[in-house]
Design a protein with these regions (language model features):
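Interdomain/boundary linker segments immediately adjacent to catalytic/signaling cores
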Residues: 1-69
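Surface-exposed cleft-lining segments at the edges of enzyme active sites
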Residues: 51-55, 100-106
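Short, well-structured alpha-helical interface segments that form or flank functional binding sites
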Residues: 57, 61, 65, 86, ...
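Short Pro/Gly-enriched beta-strand edge/turn motifs at strand-loop
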Residues: 71-77
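Active-site metal-binding core of divalent-cation-utilizing nuclease and nuclease-like domains
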Residues: 77-92
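Conserved catalytic cores of phosphodiester-cleaving nucleases, focusing on short active-site segments
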Residues: 91-102
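Catalytic cores of nucleic-acid endonucleases
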Residues: 102-156
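Domain-level recognition of nuclease-like catalytic cores that cleave nucleotide substrates
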Residues: 134-186
């Protein structure tokens, strides 16, 4: 019916994926809260219902808040740079080209290549690429790719410190100021 060589090849593929699936571990990301989740009263269980949705939305909030902080309190603020259709960062503060991410959860080659290319593009135009991550549970391969691409990567408290050192705004204190005002009801 099927050639033995074919069956062995398919079996080898299936076995390799069985082992990969069996040994797959998931980050604790979905069980850990952060300052934005707390601002809205988003529980870990609610976030687990649709991680991609919450990650995308919380990432946009992070980007908008950081941008507003630098716009109103940063020195030498400028909006995002554009190179053709590409927008390799969210804002400029002096020589720092700042991009914001909630976390980097994708390790696909396209995403990693983009970070490397954008880092080189920004450096070649006289900027220091700075990546401000809200969380500290991003994929290690993604962080490595960013650093290889010339990005200065700050995670969690280091991001908060960077923001404070460049604007005087304590983002944790700022979000606590609005605590319980925007709790979602579900």
């Amino acid at each position: 019916m099927y050639k033995e060589e074919f069956l062995v090849e398919v079996e080898t593929i299936l076995q390799a994926y069985k082992e990969s699936f069996s040994s797959k571990t998931y980050s604790m990301e979905s069980n850990i809260s952060d300052i934005l989740m707390e601002s809205f009263g988003i529980s870990a269980s609610l976030k687990r219902e649709n991680r991609q949705y919450w990650g995308r939305e919380l990432g946009m909030i992070w980007q908008l808040i950081v941008n507003a902080i630098f716009k109103h309190h940063g020195t030498e603020y400028a909006p995002a740079l554009k190179f053709g259709l590409d927008e390799p960062c969210d804002l400029i503060c002096g020589n720092d080209a700042i991009d914001t991410k909630y976390r980097i959860g994708s390790g696909d080659s396209g995403t990693l290549k983009k970070f490397k290319n954008y880092g080189h593009l920004l450096r070649s135009n006289g900027f220091r690429p700075v990546l401000l991550l809200l969380r500290d549970d991003s994929l290690t391969a993604a962080i490595t790719a960013c650093k290889t691409g010339g990005w200065e990567v700050f995670e969690n408290k280091d991001s908060f410190d960077y923001i404070f050192n460049n604007t005087g705004v304590d983002i944790v204190e700022l979000l606590h100021y609005f605590e319980n005002k925007f709790q979602i009801m579900r």
